[in-house]
């Protein structure tokens, strides 16, 4: 038996699920765009038709054996159980035969059941203990806080919050789950059913004891006698909660994602002498084969923003990763979402197989589950508003509610029927039972507690408790080590369970540790994962490398070849300041990165894969080589271009402090992200930190000039110590030749150096050089002996910050779990909501805000059918027929030609509801996008016609498109969103009042009156899934689409009742005359009956069927059965049947080409003839419409009206998202005060004038975080425009750009003014200047234009960038570039000749010159004692006599303070601040010119926004259509 092999990787099928808890890994090798060729139909023990038999009697054979694991029979014979399950297909026989050969073969005939039995055989042979567990949860209640409703908080509410916190009644504690029970023996499957908000997710979390985020939890839970506290402490990896959302590192491939989970849970006691690497590889291939993912091994998992595997494949990656962690008890929260019915069945069937063979216990919530899936479960739990109304055998659940008095539709599936019980509008009592059935959750719960099924459950729980909590000593006869039979005692079970877990742990892992591998192994695995994440993201690596190289070349050329003289003394400080600041601040993006991966780390932490500290340390380590390379390139280029101290020691010291400074700041930003609860607060503190770091590094203002109230900040700034050491390294033991001695000019050439001085602070009289060490001490108070002391301090800061990050990662567990709640505008909420918010109200379910007493305070829709029918009569009735023929769609992927649609044809007519179906990846959404003219890449060929004529520019405006993703402006109310659509999409000839009246009709039709004034928001904070879907449909209906309504997966993610409600609504729309084409994923038989026609696609975008469905799908079923398909059972679901027939599913295949069957069928010929007839009838018709000018226009409304509507909506969006405005306001006020009091009350000394220069400079640098704050909102609005509004031609892109620019102006003026006041008056710019009112007004005016400048600059950058992250990088790069040439860091006179043009080109030259020259013009300079230059005159002359010629003939001469002295002449280099500004080429006389030029730059930016938006967002869309070949016949 292999005990060690502690190399790198892991084990098989999750040690086959904890040596009873892991199933399925990965194995395929084709690109994920291709059809999978692996056949896993027979890999699933219930995938054959006969397997339904086994499922129907819910595995009684297994349950009759209690917890006894399967004991394999001879490997050469099929087991009796196998025979009893009637798996009698020939393929099954061949699988059994193959068991005698290589049972671990993962070929095309792979059989999961046989694999697992062979695997258990090998465990027995190697004497490996396995473990399994059941669960008993008794009287469990979960409480949270919140009413389920909130009032919208606008910007002013931030200031009113303290008052309302006092006056408004505090929200009371609410019950999410109330006195629920759960019991599952090892190896059982439990389905949890209920409407959204019933508490299903909370129930699953409770089963896995994942309840730390709730307010309070009551009740007891144990796992075969192991207390939940002990289970979470010692065996947390045995409990899995797999959430609904797919949370992964998007840059990792599928194989890398699964490998990592398997490595971290690889047991030490592996069967068959497998090494860790062999184990991990086998696990990966096994899980992937079971879930049909092998072809995605080398494809990135991706996410909504990173292209990767498809949505259905990503869901399967989530499931596979869960299996790789080897849980004994797994809870799967709506894990079938996004999967087609066949793939969903395959997933649950794998759970069934693992339950049977490995005793893995699973709880599953699933929406729209099929009958076939339902039959695989042992127990059913039904929840109603947090109340448990049934928990018992699956085969008794339906009858329980039938006996209660409810009726079930003949073709309604059992899961749909059970879910409908909790919906008052969907449940139907039988005749005579109307007043006898329960109505409220309390009544249902009470009836359940009085039932015999409840009594049976209590008796079974009592027996379970007695069995697994007894303390009888273990039997003297040792039980089998690979099973926990029903005859063993609780003590023996617990000891064996502990032994099994301990045996899996690597050496040096404590027996009580929850982790499987050592910390060093965890660290190694995390290092490998971090490396893979970097390598798989070449765009990030490339952008960072480019940024470092670009900046080094720019700065190096600006400060090119500095001389060892006093002219470049100031410039050397500028180079060193920029070097360390730039390298350090490149880590600012770490904040966003840390928050993006926080949910992933939390998920892995819950599964005990690794210490979070291992990930913290690994990410810091992996970052080092990339930082080393980037800073190496930066240092080499910049150091030698600028001619810094050219010694080996000087260069390596420079490099060392840049590297350690950047590394320390990376740890600072990471630790900041680790201790903050959300990204907004971390980013705000990060922005403030950047400002403090930049100011207190020591270059902008020497620390000795900072007031005592802020001076301590410098000692918290690691870069201050780094900058000090860089300055010491550069200046120590060096003498800088004086470029010009004072006095100079005619008559002074013959005087010796002894009578002159260098005009530099710290210069000694009578010397022609400046000593570097003295300069540092006099100017900065730097002492050369502190160089290496500073290194130790920075390392100490780094160690402390890493420690903080590690402690935060291990101890802090931020509450990211929020219940769903509606948000209403104040004064517009229903009365019940006002009561719920202001008075505590009724107990509401925090998952959706439903009244836990059974009502729903937001459902007040009228039930008057007659009234609703009148509203349907107002729907625009269509008369046009949309048809397409021979439609092909080709794209290029990595240079390879792919055809996504292949010769598709069909038509949609008014009054008919047409379904578009197919498995995942068949091209449903692609076809919908092509038909709706919404694809922007590739080549489309074929005919798309309206009434036999080609499409015109009005097509998109006259159609509605309901996207699968509900894309909205989250801050709009439902009514506002519909009014916006109606106002801009209905013809201009229709009065606005009439448009709004129609909106009210649509709201009534969709039964949205009760939440019409609710904010759409985001999922969790706003409308729930069904409400958002209704709002999306409403937005399209409000436009009165005269031609066609497209809908993409309108029922995706909805429970069965919500899906039924949506489809019934579509049915009524079609009956009212609307033409509808709708894709649908998992329709039940009843749902499917609502459709008139079907277009069925198979992989490759090939048509399998198009035509009528027929009553009860008879026409459709007859077609397939007449062409050789097996007969569809009378109680079967036709939608599932046709998908099974054509081989849909992740692992399914078919031996027949149904596309070829269709092409050769009479039905296809009939459709072609029908298309010819339709087109001919319209082409021959004399009644051809002549569209008016209004009808022919691309947009329904004029540009001015578009701008008005979009601007109003954007302003509302800003006003209703107070976090954006508050962060902007807080940054302006805080930064203004911070800079103001840092440079507080500057006097008239030379250093004071320079400090004022940097005070102005820092005021302009503030634009960087402000731009970073406005770009995400701009991109958010732009994404809505691009995804939904632009394709529908709602309004012009010009309207979008102008509205985005205009809406920023009032906020910039108000907040900019507040910054100006907080910045201007503490520095006391107004002191000592003439006409302070005029100059203050000028400075304010120029700064207000600067507010407009940076906002339009940021919008221009955002227009060209795909996302906010990229925009932030580009923005920082460009902003740094333009701000570098303004003459502050390097005066224009010192610039290399090549760059002089850039000084004149950058707008910051005119901004800073305008502000500073205005604010210091005419100020007298009063040198302080250390700023005075001491000159010794020749013997016999007074200071005045000696200096008179110099002072008279030189306009730039300073001020001589003691003209009568004969020694030690005190000379101040400047008389006025204007002379100081001349050094930077700044003049007061340019101020109005500067204002005019800067205003010109503002208008240039506006033009740039328009141009870049057109080039990157509009022209791109249009240019791609040039590649399309779409023909028409009209």
From Swiss-Prot:
Gene Ontology CC, one term: plasma membrane
One GO MF term: ATP hydrolysis activity
Binding site for ATP: 918-925
Subcellular location(s) of the protein: Membrane
Basic and acidic residues composition-biased segments: 54-64
UniProt keyword list: Antibiotic resistance, ATP-binding, Glycoprotein, Membrane, Nucleotide-binding, Phosphoprotein, Repeat, Transmembrane, Transmembrane helix, Transport
The ABC transporter domain, residue ranges: 153-410, 882-1125
InterPro entries reported for this sequence: AAA+_ATPase, ABC2_TM, ABC_trans_N, ABC_transporter-like_ATP-bd, ABC_transporter-like_CS, ABCG_dom, ABCG_PDR_1, ABCG_PDR_2
Biased composition range(s): Low complexity: 36-48, 72-93
Modified residues (Phosphoserine): 486, 489
Primary location group: membrane
Family according to the record: Belongs to the ABC transporter superfamily. ABCG family. PDR (TC 3.A.1.205) subfamily.
UniProt name for this protein: Brefeldin A resistance protein
Natural source organism: Schizosaccharomyces pombe (strain 972 / ATCC 24843) (Fission yeast)
Lineage of source species: Eukaryota, Fungi, Dikarya, Ascomycota, Taphrinomycotina
